[in-house]
């Protein structure tokens, strides 16, 4: 069944920060159980079925090699650590995306989160999923 904005999820907000100067370089949300799982997702990629071609039972999506993820795989990535900004709790997926947007925008107002491609995950969800 397709994910919906009104689905109840157990999600939290994480951030990557530089160990050499404490700058926040990226913030995101996850429905993963641990912050380590979210880190592994970004650093190493994954093979979830939603990323398989439709002919093989997936949705045809591909793993996205964003600027952020590419940087994690470079020497620069060794200076980045992940941590919880908002501990996971039960909420709707829409509430999680709104919280993520708020946390990204507050950091960008301070000149941080410069590796976030978008400042509005909810807008992007609606754009790409048509909801």
Where are these regions (language model features)?
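Conserved short loop/helix modules at catalytic or binding sites
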Residues: 31-93
């Amino acid at each position: 069944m397709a994910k919906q904005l009104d689905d109840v999820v157990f999600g939290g907000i994480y951030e990557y920060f530089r160990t050499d100067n404490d700058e926040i370089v990226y913030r995101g949300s996850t429905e993963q159980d641990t912050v380590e799982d979210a880190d592994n997702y970004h650093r190493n990629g994954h093979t979830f079925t939603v990323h398989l071609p439709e002919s093989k039972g997936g949705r045809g999506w591909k793993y996205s090699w964003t600027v952020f993820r590419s940087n994690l795989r470079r020497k620069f990535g060794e200076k980045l650590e992940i941590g919880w900004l908002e501990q996971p709790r039960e909420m709707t997926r829409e509430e999680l995306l709104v919280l993520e947007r708020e946390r990204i925008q507050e950091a960008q107002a301070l000149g941080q989160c410069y590796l976030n491609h978008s400042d509005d995950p909810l807008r992007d969800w609606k754009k790409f999923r048509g909801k």
